[in-house]
Design a protein with these regions (language model features):
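Short phosphate-binding loop-to-helix
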Residues: 55-93, 100-103
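Hydrophobic targeting segments
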Residues: 2-6, 29, 45-46
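N-terminal nucleotide-binding beta1-loop-alpha1 segment
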Residues: 1-16, 20
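C-terminal catalytic/acceptor-binding lobe
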Residues: 188-223
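Short coil/turn segments at beta-strand junctions that form active-site/ligand-binding loops
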Residues: 1, 43-44, 89-91, 97
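Short, polar loop motifs at secondary-structure junctions
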Residues: 49-55
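A short, N-terminal amphipathic alpha-helix
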Residues: 27-43
Length: 223
């Protein structure tokens, strides 16, 4: 199983990738890599997908251009979130690059088994440690890559037909993968991660997450 941290997108309000924002002195992407290794993932199986060479200092970069824009209601914008997946035929777990994962979240993602596709996200009722009033997506574990590719194509067809209320992101893709009703989140259809794990939209989000995080130690960081 390969692990690809998705660090693409075009965030116009930022002067640097938000995946490099620091949580307790550690870049978010570096933290994710560290937690994967601490959970037993071989460093040679960890990659970053991006067209930004700055990420080479953290892990091998799989060049992947994704011009996704943050305005999910701008249907006419050419950038699509569904283009974020690096194409491969190998079993692969795709992790959102701007998510601050807890050790337990990474454990759940690594240890969950599937022969098709699994999705990981928060869900109500939320943990007291969670910092947003809505659910957020965190990762996809994909063994059946042809299924993912066909679902992405179908999601984009539905978008062009006007079937979605916004540009499709992880939730809409999962609805297509599971052949669910569109525009409705079925919270019982995926693996729940309910702790402080959450994505970061800005420094204010990071500060909230840091307040909720317990004291954590890492032998790698100590050594």
């Amino acid at each position: 199983m390969k692990y690809i941290i998705m660090c693409g997108g075009n965030y116009q309000n930022w002067y640097f990738p938000r995946q490099l924002l620091e949580v307790k002195g550690e870049p978010i992407v570096a933290r994710t890599i560290r937690l994967l290794k601490e959970r037993g993932v071989d460093p040679e199986d960890i990659f970053i997908s991006s067209d930004n060479p700055v990420f080479k200092q953290y892990a091998p970069v799989l060049h992947h251009e994704n011009r996704y824009e943050t305005d999910i209601f701008d249907i006419d914008n050419n950038g699509l979130w569904t283009d974020a997946f690096y194409p491969t035929d190998e079993p692969c777990t795709y992790l959102m690059g701007d998510v601050v994962f807890s050790p337990d979240a990474i454990k759940t993602i690594v240890e969950t088994e599937t022969d098709d596709i699994e999705f990981f996200a928060s869900a109500p009722p939320f943990s007291p440690l969670y910092t947003k009033p809505w659910a957020e997506p965190f990762a996809f574990k994909v063994v059946n890559q042809p299924h993912l590719r066909s679902a992405i194509q179908l999601t984009q067809i539905f978008m062009r037909q006007g079937a979605f209320r916004r540009k499709p992101i992880a939730w809409e893709l999962w609805q297509v993968i599971k052949t669910q009703a569109l525009n409705v989140i079925e919270y019982d259809s995926y693996v729940h991660i309910n702790d402080y794990t959450c994505d970061v939209d800005g420094p204010e989000d990071l500060a909230k997450i840091e307040e909720k995080m317990p004291y954590e130690t890492s032998m790698e960081r100590i050594g």
